[in-house]
Amino acid sequence: CRNMNWTGALYEPIIAGNNTQTLRIYGSLTFIASMTNSFQGKVYFESIEQGNMITCAGKSFNNDVVFQGSGGWSLGDDFTCTRGLIFQSGSFQTMGKNISCSNFISTSGLNRYLDIENSTINLVYLYNNVYYCPWEVNGDNLTLKSQKSNLIYANHNYETFRHYNEAKEYNNIFYNGSPYSGSINGGGCSFNIIQVGVDTVGSLSYNP
């Protein structure tokens, strides 16, 4: 579809589908509070235009959400998906809203503009997810704006942060759960704060 806007819909609508189906949106998306999102498949945002807005109204995505195409997307409110947020190309701006996902993946090497300023990204890893590393980013052809942003880990094992190729500036990383043998492979990136919570059990290695 071009734009999906549920504003004004009556009778508590439900969007449904199994995990073999996909939903492709070529513009903006607006959910409403009275609806239910039971769609289990992947969702693809594939606009070639700027100015697209995503408004979730408290609804979660139940599978990977993929942003690809040369367009631009901004968040109108907080964004939650139980699996991966995959940013392949285009422009993605959080507008100070918060994100919760299992993985944030941006490895394509295509032109990307990523603005997470003033936002918190909660990485709540789903252990049977196909993606190994909760945060994995290829710095080539990427513009990153991260001032006053936070990456918060809750329940991760092994490699938790991987950035490679062109180095970027990140802000804060917090571990509030148990990283166990967690590791940060920084790829030459700079950080403001890397902090492990007082109740966190395990070890964390840092490879700059």
Give the residues covered by each predicted segment:
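Extracellular beta-sheet-rich ligand-binding/adhesion modules
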Residues: 1-208
